[in-house]
């Protein structure tokens, strides 16, 4: 089920290249550690293979359908505990923390120079103990609703979304990662709990640490937070829908009060096979080679004020 499991060979090669230690706990959680002598800080990231495109799955035989923006909304809610906001706990230790959601993953991270064990407990504890109520969800719906409206005022963000809506006719990628005000209004506590049961299982997650820390220290943190032992797993089945449809639109236009026109070009490629790192890197390079700042196309577009 896990994308991370499918990428184990790539992880092993990458880990060896950077001198990274790795282990898989009996619970299924993958722990990566890059001990860096001479460094005074520690960076940690706790990630799950759950992003905005994961909208349909079955949990213990029951189908679950999620509205757009669920993964991003859940990211916000995971940072809230009955005892308060996790970022306030980080502030007391002097750590810098953040979280983000992409199309295929959600990540929680911190960097710190002191109280590393305490910060690891905050990180693993908040993600491992979800807490949702109707009242807290309603409050967050208002907050994220304002965030969505703020991004609607960003020309670059709207341009990116317009490109995706041209590329995809009926695929979750065409929807904004944050969803819409209307879509997140559909969320309930049970929907979010279903997501944590399905995607926040240790076997679908990775803890990666680097800096002034050892692998044993990271594993001990997992033990303290109940992430070491094997546990009964929910039966989960999910798949990202295939997209074999032609382009939804060849072009799109919108108007906004901007100082200069915004212009974007997108090319629809075949889906990447999980673990095909070589092709992924080649596609990343292709953008620079075709429309990068040193290309003739870029200069021609620049000269025509595009």
Explain the meaning of each model-derived region.
Residues 1-86, 193-300:
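His/Glu-rich zincin catalytic helix
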Residues 3, 82-195, 216, 243:
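Acidic/histidine-enriched segments that form metal/cofactor-coordinating
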Residues 303-306:
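Short, intrinsically disordered, charge-balanced linker/junction segments flanking boundaries
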């Amino acid at each position: 089920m896990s994308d991370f499991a499918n990428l184990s060979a790539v992880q092993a090669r990458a880990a060896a290249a950077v001198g990274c230690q790795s282990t898989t706990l009996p619970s299924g959680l993958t722990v990566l550690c890059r001990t860096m002598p001479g460094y005074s800080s520690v960076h940690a990231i706790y990630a799950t293979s759950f992003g905005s495109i994961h909208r349909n799955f079955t949990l213990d035989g029951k189908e679950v359908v999620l509205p757009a923006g669920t993964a991003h909304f859940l990211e916000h809610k995971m940072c809230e505990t009955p005892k308060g906001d996790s970022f306030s706990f980080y502030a007391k230790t002097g750590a810098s923390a953040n979280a983000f959601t992409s199309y295929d993953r959600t990540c929680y991270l911190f960097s710190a120079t002191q109280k590393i064990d305490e910060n690891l407990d905050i990180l693993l504890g908040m993600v491992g103990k979800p807490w949702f109520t109707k009242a807290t969800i309603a409050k967050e719906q208002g907050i994220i609703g304002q965030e969505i409206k703020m991004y609607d005022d960003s020309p670059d963000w709207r341009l990116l979304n317009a490109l995706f809506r041209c590329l995809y006719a009926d695929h979750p990628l065409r929807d904004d990662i944050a969803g819409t005000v209307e879509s997140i209004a559909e969320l309930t506590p049970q929907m979010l709990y279903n997501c944590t049961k399905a995607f926040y299982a240790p076997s679908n997650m990775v803890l990666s640490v680097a800096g002034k820390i050892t692998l044993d220290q990271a594993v001990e943190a997992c033990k303290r937070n109940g992430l070491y032992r094997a546990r009964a797993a929910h039966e989960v089945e999910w798949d990202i829908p295939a997209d074999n449809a032609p382009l939804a639109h060849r072009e799109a236009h919108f108007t906004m009060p901007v100082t200069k026109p915004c212009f974007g070009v997108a090319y629809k490629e075949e889906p990447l096979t999980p673990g095909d790192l070589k092709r992924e890197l080649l596609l990343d390079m292709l953008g620079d080679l075709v429309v990068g700042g040193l290309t003739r196309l870029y200069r021609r577009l620049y000269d025509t004020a595009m």
